[in-house]
Curated annotation (Swiss-Prot):
Catalyzes the first step in hexosamine metabolism, converting fructose-6P into glucosamine-6P using glutamine as a nitrogen source. It is an enzyme of class 2 (transferase). Homodimer. It catalyses: D-fructose 6-phosphate + L-glutamine = D-glucosamine 6-phosphate + L-glutamate. Its EC number is 2.6.1.16. One of its GO terms (molecular function) is carbohydrate derivative binding. Residues 287-427, 460-601 form the SIS domain. Its main location: cytoplasm. This is Glutamine--fructose-6-phosphate aminotransferase [isomerizing].
Length: 611
């Protein structure tokens, strides 16, 4: 959600800023802009609505060059997506700022600054920041010190970068609730909201922590913590190749990432399985001691990660015998929570920077939970740093806004957690762990077999091309998978989709079913299959068209208004992981047929770093 890039160097940095913004396009945005301090000491700005490519054209048509600059992609919160609301924002033509987050007291500050003679040209909360700093510079002329003073008056979340024409030797930044990372070079340094933006110029990074303020010069980086103490943050070298930011032979990042799932699941399992058991130490050196005390689990997440948590509830209770609650992070953080004794708090996030999930974790630390575990795809994220234990999903960078490989690796990680807890507590049935460990080893192969259904699913997608509504059904642990399928379809094809437990059809959803509303269901060959078949007959009796992803041994066949796609057999416990694949493919091909922007769907952002 929004992207920041900044640079201070001995060379022209305009192309670096634009390339950085391109690498942040996956986060979702509606406008883009940059500001550069030119050789004649003047701050110049270019802003455009739409894609970064349009900003690039504007810069080519009216070039600007300099060695200090900031750039931004905006996802509208305060103020419509217009060029006037796009960042950077100026004050006095000599101070420029870019900002991610939400300033909650912006109206109060706006009125105060208007009283001081400042004229506002946008509807954004960000413009308040730049005028406030401009005013502060009148009494505190050093840019870094002025920033330190000004942020004390800001309430809310922010990651911001600031430059001044009067102090051309530095870029300054502040972080509170919105991530920022410094990229370290030789005679040049950089800033971004995501290290992926800077991978073309460096592989060494320094992550700002909550409350940090940074002064970034060509040959020096200085950081102060929220108490005002000068601190040194760890330098991390990133070794993964840059091919993650390349679609390769695939038409879209989403399709590429769907097809990467066998390999990333294999990577997530490597080094975490013994001969016939899960290696508990994979969760951290204190995991065994902490897991032995666990009597309950509380899972908190958002979006796709929430669906992964819902699947895990079925596993934890049926396999490990541990009561589990799952809650949306934005709800958990604002309600009065009664914490059961010896409850493990589990947070799930692809980015590790999701604002509501982070806030829920921080709230949980005050509520008396036994300990915290983060299941996350980014090892240097805030969520990981602030949790007691961690299990990384190892999915690699995910560029498509609609999550695919992050979801399946989250599910794999949650199964590892289920088996580890059951192992330590002695609550698994005899032979279950060894059996499921063997099935996990076969899982990458099974996922590859599911991907071989690609052409079949592409053909079925034609049924949805002219539809406006779709119903997804599932039973047991497949209900959250149906929810994930519905989310994917609505995210990228813009078809309204809802998911229900199949047993709830008679309690309302059946009223919606007709020959213009396809019904999608997943049907593994388990004890609920016959119940599910009865539910599907109810759909057919009302003229509903069925698309059924069924186990190859389920005995289901095509018929009038019924399209059965056979799915490779897999152990029932792992079926939620496997059945995710065809639902992802279905959503993808429907979106392609409808001509939507698959990788960057409208109004959505990859990493939601504000409430």
């Amino acid at each position: 959600m929004c992207g920041i890039v900044g640079a201070v160097a001995e060379r022209n940095i305009t192309a670096i800023l634009i390339e950085g913004l391109k690498r942040l396009e996956y986060r979702g945005y509606d406008s883009a802009g940059l500001a550069v301090l030119t050789q004649n000491g003047e701050l110049q700005r270019r802003r455009r609505i739409g894609k970064v490519s349009e900003l690039e054209v504007a810069v080519a048509d009216d070039p600007l060059a300099g060695q200090l600059g900031i750039a931004h992609t905006r996802w509208a919160t305060h103020g419509a997506p217009t060029e006037g609301n796009a960042h950077p924002h100026f004050s006095g033509n000599d101070v420029a700022v870019v900002h991610n987050g939400i300033i909650e007291n912006h109206e109060e500050l706006r009125e105060e600054l208007k009283g001081l003679g400042y004229v506002f040209t946008s509807q954004t909360d960000t413009e308040v920041i730049v005028h406030l700093i401009h005013h502060t510079l009148k009494s505190i002329p050093d840019l870094t010190d002025a920033l330190k003073a000004a942020v004390k008056r800001l309430h809310g979340a922010y990651g911001l970068a600031l430059i001044s024409a009067k102090q051309p030797d530095r870029l300054v930044a502040a972080r509170s609730g919105s991530p920022l990372v410094i990229g370290l070079g030789l005679g040049e340094n950089f800033l971004a909201s995501d290290q992926l933006a800077l991978r073309q110029v460096t592989d060494r990074f320094m992550y700002l922590e909550e409350g940090d303020i940074a002064e970034i010069r060509r040959d020096q980086v200085s950081i102060w913590d929220q108490q005002g103490n000068k601190v040194q943050r760890e330098t991390v070298q990133y070794h993964e190749g840059a091919e993650a930011a390349d679609k390769g032979a695939y038409r879209h990042f989403m399709l590429k990432e769907i097809h990467e799932q066998p390999s990333v699941v294999q990577r997530t399992l490597e080094g975490r399985l013994g001969k016939d058991n899960v290696l508990v130490q994979a969760f951290g050196p204190q995991a065994a001691d902490l897991f032995a005390k666990v009597r309950n689990v509380q899972i908190v997440a958002c979006g796709t990660s929430y669906h992964a948590g819902m699947v895990a509830r079925y596993w934890l209770e049926s396999l490990a015998g541990i009561p589990c609650q799952v809650e949306v992070a934005s709800e958990f953080r604002y309600r009065k929570v009664v914490v059961q004794p010896d409850t493990l708090f589990v947070s799930i996030s692809q980015s590790g920077e999701t604002a509501d999930t982070l806030a829920a974790l921080r709230n949980a630390k005050e509520l008396g939970f036994l300990g915290s575990l983060a299941i996350c795809n980014v090892g240097i994220s805030s969520l990981v740093r602030e949790s007691d234990l961690t299990l990384l999903t190892l999915a690699g960078p995910e560029i498509g806004v609609a999550s695919t490989k992050a979801f399946t690796t989250q599910l794999v990680s949650l199964m590892l957690l289920t088996l580890a807890l059951g192992q330590v507590r002695g609550t698994l049935e005899a032979g279950v762990e060894a059996e499921l460990v063997e099935e996990l080893r076969r899982l990458p192969t099974r996922l590859g077999e599911a991907l071989a259904m690609d052409a079949t699913v592409e053909k079925i997608a034609e049924l949805f091309a002219d539809k406006h509504h779709t119903l997804f059904l599932g039973r047991g642990a497949q209900y959250p998978v149906a929810m994930e399928g519905a989310l994917k379809l609505k995210e990228i094809s813009y078809i309204h989709a809802e998911a229900y437990p199949a047993g709830e059809l008679k309690h309302g959803p059946l009223a919606l079913v007709d020959n213009d509303m396809p019904v999608v269901t997943v049907a593994p060959n388990n004890e609920l299959l016959e119940k599910l078949k009865s539910n599907l007959q109810e759909v057919r009796a009302r003229g509903g068209e069925l698309v059924v992803f069924a186990d190859e041994h389920a005995g289901m066949t095509n018929g009038e208004g019924t399209h059965v796609i056979k799915v490779p057999h897999i152990a029932d416990a792992l079926a939620p992981i496997l059945y995710t694949i065809p639902l992802q493919l279905l959503s993808y091909y429907v979106a392609v047929l409808k001509g939507t922007d698959v990788d960057q769907p409208r109004n959505l952002a990859k990493s939601v770093t504000v409430e």
